[in-house]
Structure formats: C-alpha cells, structure tokens
C-alpha cells in the first residue's frame, strides 16, 4: 500500500484476466493502495513466478496486490485484513470478479501468523501500515511458523525512513527500489542455506 488514494476510491487491476478493471475500495484512514507504478515494477519482477503460485497477502488493505496476483493466474490467494469494512469490500470485489480461488481472512495478521499453517506459500506480500514496526515482526512469524515454501518470494514494502530492516540469513535480496516515501524490496527464501550451515 503506497500513497492513500482518497479521490477515486478505486483500485485498478493492471494486467491479466481482469486487466483495466476498476474496483471500489473502502476509504479508511491510513489505507495506501500500492500505486500502479510500484505494482507494475513488482509484477515485472514476479512475471516468471506468479502463474500457479500460492499467494499470501499479510496486510491486504485495498487488495491491490492480491487481486493483481489472481488476475495474473496465481493458483490461490489468502488475503488477511484487520479492518472489517475493508475485508468485506474485498469479499464483494472477489464476488464481482467471480473469483473462487481466494479467501479473505478478517483478522490481525500477527495473531494469525502465530497460529501457523498446514500449507506453505510461494509468494508473500508484506505491506503493513507504516510507522508501526510491523514488517520485522511479520518476517519473524513467517519463519518461526513455517509459512514459506522453499524458494518462496517475499515482497516487503516499508517507509523509506525506516532506519534498518533485518531479514534472516536464509533470505536472499533480489531487488530493491524506492519511489517517493516508499522503499520496496524482493527477497527469496532459500532453506538449503540453513541446512548447509547446520552441517558445516
């Protein structure tokens, strides 16, 4: 979620099966739908990996990232959103698109991640509200409770003023860019790094 868009109250899907579709978003304070420019860059990065992937959007908000992934033929998406009104709008948008390979979970992301999962994910979006120290905690829970498949790709979007952002040694930095007040990065989780270290 980059800048808050208060004028249109819509999110536009850039490409894929729902290309150029505009969907309503619930106007909440602090909601920052990721801009078209940033999303286009991100999904260029993911172009060879998105089709058939299991996707987890930890802070869904407007659904801009999860819906874009589904439009580009991700196999399944789980979208976590704390605010009930925003979660309900996401469910309505999925119904409008007649999308049946997604779920919206109205829950606190950190609490849900702490419960663990029976099935890992291939692509994870971490785009939390800014200035709340959530990105680092989210990373820790993803690792502790085994949410990531090996070679999973993890997208992290934070405020550019964040002093530091630490990731596990098993996360390889692939891409990093800045757009205005937003810094966004792509990592890949490589479990074999941990296994190799353990045997040395």
What are the language-model segments listed below?
Residues 1-200:
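Class I S-adenosyl-L-methionine-dependent methyltransferase catalytic core
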């Amino acid at each position: 979620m980059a800048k808050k868009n208060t004028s249109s109250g819509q999110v536009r899907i850039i490409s894929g099966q729902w290309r150029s579709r505009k969907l309503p978003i619930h106007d909440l304070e602090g909601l920052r739908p990721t801009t078209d420019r940033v999303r286009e860059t991100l999904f260029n990065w993911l172009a060879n990996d998105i089709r058939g992937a299991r996707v987890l959007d930890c802070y869904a908000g407007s659904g801009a990232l999860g819906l874009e992934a589904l439009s580009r033929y991700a196999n399944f998406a789980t979208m976590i959103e704390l605010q009930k009104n925003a979660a309900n709008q996401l469910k309505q948008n999925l119904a409008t698109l007649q999308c049946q390979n997604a779920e919206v979970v109205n829950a606190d992301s950190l609490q849900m991640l702490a419960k663990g999962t029976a099935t890992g994910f291939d692509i994870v979006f971490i785009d939390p509200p800014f200035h709340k120290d959530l990105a680092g905690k989210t990373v820790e829970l993803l690792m502790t409770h085994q949410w990531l498949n090996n070679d999973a790709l993890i997208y992290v979007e934070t405020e550019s003023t964040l002093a530091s952002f630490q990731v596990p040694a098993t996360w390889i930095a692939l891409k990093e860019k800045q757009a205005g007040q937003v810094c966004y990065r792509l990592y890949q989780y490589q479990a074999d790094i941990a296994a190799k270290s353990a045997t040395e």
